[in-house]
Amino acid sequence: MTHRRQNFMGGAAILAGAVAVTKLLGALYKIPLGNLLDREGMAHFYAAYNIYSLLLVLSTAGLPVALSRMVSRAAAQRRCGAVRRCLHLGLALLAALGLVCSAVMCLLPEALAAALHDPNAAPALRTLGPAVLLVCLSAALRGYSQGLGDMVPTAAGQVAESAGKLLIGLGLCLYLLRQGAGTDLCAAGAIGGVTAGAGLGLLVTALLLPRRAALPEVRDVPPASSRVLRELLRTGIPITVGAAGMSLITLLDQALVTATLRDTLGYTTAETTALYGEYTFGMTLFMLPPSFIYPLSVSLMPAVSAALTRRDRTAAGIAAGAALKLTVLAALPAGVGLSVLAGPILHLLYPAVPETAEAAAYHLTFLGLACVFVCLMVATNGVLQSYGHPLLPVISLLCGGVLKIVTNYLMVGDPATGIRGAAVSTLYCYALIAVINLAAIARLVPERPGYISLFAKPVLLTAVMALAARSGYGLFCRLLPERWAVLPAVLLAAVVYVVLALAIGAVTRQDLQTLPKGEKLADRLHLR
């Protein structure tokens, strides 16, 4: 075969870099939108985007991974016919799923918008519909490419998709605003960038793939189509169910919160939309740390699986412990930092809508803490799946979902708390999921590090960092305009955290060695 195969660490580094770039572009896309659309427009935007995210996860989370594994196995055996059969059937299956999901969004936008109690979100839903099919096709090609060991088409396609979303989405939104369009059409224009970006990402992936993944003539007898489809579904469905957790909870949250505000507290549809819009400003930042930490956790999971394949449970426990430790070290300062500086950060990012930023600060205070548990959920899900327990994350997700329903009803339905209860219930939900997963790992992975040693130093470091952040912000407010004082405060907190982490040995060479390029990073930090 003439495809280009990268080593695991190099491939993981390429994907991690692409994810970092795409999430940065995503922030540059959504944060300006908040200033342009304010709370009503962002509520319409997220109503469509939350449905899209769930349908996208259901379509693309598991099957491309299953396709990648099957292609990798067949390629290692130099069975070109099997590789082609996997690609063709995987592409057909994903195209069918994408077509169904796109049809639902394009043909039933009014019904979907009504289910979320936001009828003005219908134009955005219709505009976003074709994106599901486009991303499904991209996911099939990317799964095939990754199975051949080449991460470049995936990385390039993701970056192109995010860049197209940023440029076209913001451009359409600005144009419609200048034309005097309503917030519903402006939100539809903004979200049209997602559809355009998906098309651009598919184009880039499709153009790169033939040159980098060419196969010789078929010389083997490919497996039966029914067998390939069964294996795709058997492998992909458990992964899909586990990956759908955050999207499902977010969509459930929106439906429950808006219904409770309208039906229990008696708000009008317009008032409900505005209140939920405030909440989405906090949600935008809440989703950032998990997005950056996800590739870190994912890049460590193959090391766990490889060790278990060798029946080396000690090495598997070390790799699982490193995944959890690095997740905690990254998630705690990110989440707590968002929490203690919620107001200053929001006022920095949303100067055009100061009242909305002020209202959203309360939500971000709790959502920042919740994102710590989201990151733990992602890491622990990966560990449990690597150890052959894919159903346990589903059980913990169901428990968290039940708690979310109960606490939403009790807190959002209380006139004393109202919409403010939504962020608190989100914190409770993800905390329960993370605790259940950690308890399962404690029972099933005896080789893992003790939880006291895992959490003690990061918690202490984060407490000192939070104190430095708040104190630094107060000090810099005397020297700089209040809006800009948060930047040096964040820098001070980051320096304090990193210096103390190295000083007290919170990070070791063994921890970093499991990461892509971790050996070089450990050398630069002079870790032993």
Where are these regions (language model features)?
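Alpha-helical transmembrane segments of multi-pass membrane transporters/permeases
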Residues: 13-18, 126, 130, 145-173, ...
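N-terminal membrane topogenesis motif
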Residues: 1-25, 81, 85, 223-246, ...
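Membrane-proximal transmembrane or re-entrant/amphipathic helices at the cytosolic face
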Residues: 471-528
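Signature of the first transmembrane helix
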Residues: 7-65, 102, 131-132, 238-259
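Membrane-interface helix-loop junctions in multi-pass transport and translocation proteins
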Residues: 152, 163-203, 207, 391, ...
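Helix-loop junctions and terminal segments of transmembrane helices
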Residues: 61-76, 282, 290-312
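Interfacial/gating helices of multi-pass transporter permease domains
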Residues: 34-54, 183-188, 230-235, 258-287, ...
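Interfacial segments at transmembrane-helix termini and the short loops linking adjacent helices
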Residues: 109-128, 273, 339-371
